[in-house]
Amino acid sequence: MEEAGCRNIIFSSSATVYGDPKEIPITENCPKGICTNPYGWTKWMQEQMLIYLQKASPEWNVILLRYFNPIGAHHSRKIGEDPKGIPNNLLPYVAKVASGALEKVHVYGNDYDTKDCTGVIDYIHVV
């Protein structure tokens, strides 16, 4: 990136960097780096490397996005997880099976070239 003159990076991190939070809702001010699994630790370490890069070289622009897996619906029931057709996310899929709308949960793919045979994509390449 440096050789190409690209000093902007948006990092796809995770809310797992918060570990098991002591307060809800989680805010930017909550303690971080108290991870409970290796995935969270790797995201936290990558965040730290990018923060140090930006401190050492202020011409770098770093944005950290900490994704959550939101589940649920608004108390009015007017917005929430109720996909049309076959859902793409696990929880609405399980909810449709539990309600009888679908017969069973299907698991697709067991032949990915990873240790646990799941598809893992950590980086987004933009051309």
What does each of the following model-derived ranges do?
Residues I51-V127:
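NAD(P)-dependent short-chain dehydrogenase/reductase
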Residues E3, R7-N8, V17-N69, K78-N89:
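Catalytic helix-loop patch of NAD(P)-dependent Rossmann-fold dehydrogenases
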Residues S13-S14:
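Conserved NAD(P)H cofactor-binding loop of Rossmann-fold oxidoreductase domains
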